Amino acid sequence: MKNHKLPYRIDRLPVIYPFHRRANNHISVGDLVYYGPCPEFYGIGEVLNVVEHLCIVDFRGTGSLSIHKDALELKYLIPIHKLNLSHLLMEV
């Protein structure tokens, strides 16, 4: 795996596991989300579709694994706006 610099400070996002109460979120189409258990893997993505307990997210290759689209369970996704985390993502 190549070691490239990520465009955002994804390493500063809090790790939130699926069994934690903060993992119970209402997510809708268009929300910016990240993968709670390991934010660096997927990066930040936009929700494209929500079907029952699954969510289709376009990560646009922003994480260290360069994943573009994936389907994940809602309990693994944390919305950026809910925790007001946008200030953590800016370059210093």
Task: Annotate each language-model stretch with its function.
Residues K2-F19, G61-V92:
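Intrinsically disordered, low-complexity, charged/polar segments
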Residues K2-P7, V29-L32, P37-L72:
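Basic/aromatic-rich interaction segments and small domains that mediate binding to polyanionic partners
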Residues Y17-H20, L32-Y34:
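A general structural-boundary detector
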Residues P18-H26, P39:
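Short, surface-exposed secondary-structure edge patches
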